Amino acid sequence: MFSYFNREPTDDFDSTSNERTNVEFKAINAQHLSYRETLESILGLFLSGKGNGVPHHCQTKSESAISRFLNYYNWSTRSLIRTIRSYILNLILAQRIKGRKPIVQVLLDLTTLEKVGKFPHLKDLIRVYNHKKGLHIVVMYLVIGNWRFPWSFRVYRGKGTASPSQLAQKLLHNLPSILTESFQIYVLGDTAFGTMKLINKIRNSFKFHTIVGIPKTRKLKDGRKVSELKTRGQQVYLKGLDIPVFLSWVWLKRDGKRVQRFVISTKQMKGITIARWGRRRWQIEGFFKTIKHCFSLHRFGQKTL
């Protein structure tokens, strides 16, 4: 982004040789050098890992300079995102091996960036959902080997708009074809993404496998609830689902008590394997903690977003 402005004037440029052009070039070069220094200061602030990611903690650039950098710029954000995604995709594709396709875990989750007060500039983006007020985003997170990448997100805008599971479907639809053709895709999510429509879509249209949570009240085609089943790994037919799935469960600690959570897989696995895959969904929680507590994402301003 800054390489163009760091280069020396070419012969063609010198051929214009008027003082005004030279002054303008120096001004532009100085401006973008300042941008670069500001970016380095922001990254240093974030990567220090102290959880002080807001501008007034920066010791090398003023709070106003950082605010200008984040709010007033003339480069394309979309182009920057495409560049970063291209770099990530190349890293992932480098993991390809001959023989059996490696697995890419696609983690889906909805998180809330809680906000207090009035936000006129954000209009309908700040909502109350699950007793939390803030910006609710559905995030798609990729895991392959030791690599972990946030890939994309969508904002949940509340009742009457696309639901979290519908937003997840849009995110999955936008996965690059070279990725889906080169790897086995396992989609992991909690009960918010365990809807019958989404599971059918993932398996029948996208041809991915899915391991998601379902509520204990979910019924089988024979009328029984999943909570009545006693054998892990057994094949079951859920009401409203066209394909067979395999059921298991995990035990979690909540408020000092053990709570049972049910997990289904569209791929045949042993019960203990399904449970292990189900637990992998919580890998994304580490990412959420990082972006909130180290990068201070939950403290974004109304115009920075």
Write out the residue ranges for each language-model feature.
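Active-site-proximal, Lys/Arg-enriched surface segment
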Residues: 71-145
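Short low-polarity hydrophobic stretches
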Residues: 56, 140-142, 210
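Generic alpha-helical scaffold signal
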Residues: 36, 60, 64, 131-134, ...
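Long, contiguous hydrophobic alpha-helical segments, chiefly transmembrane helices and signal peptides
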Residues: 66, 137-138, 153, 193
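Acidic/polar, glycine-rich intrinsically disordered N-terminal extensions of enzymes
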Residues: 47-54
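Short, basic interhelical loop/turn and adjoining N-cap
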Residues: 57-71
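Non-membrane alpha-helical segments in proteins
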Residues: 37-45, 108
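Single, function-defining residue in the core of a domain
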Residues: 1-36, 40, 50, 99-102, ...
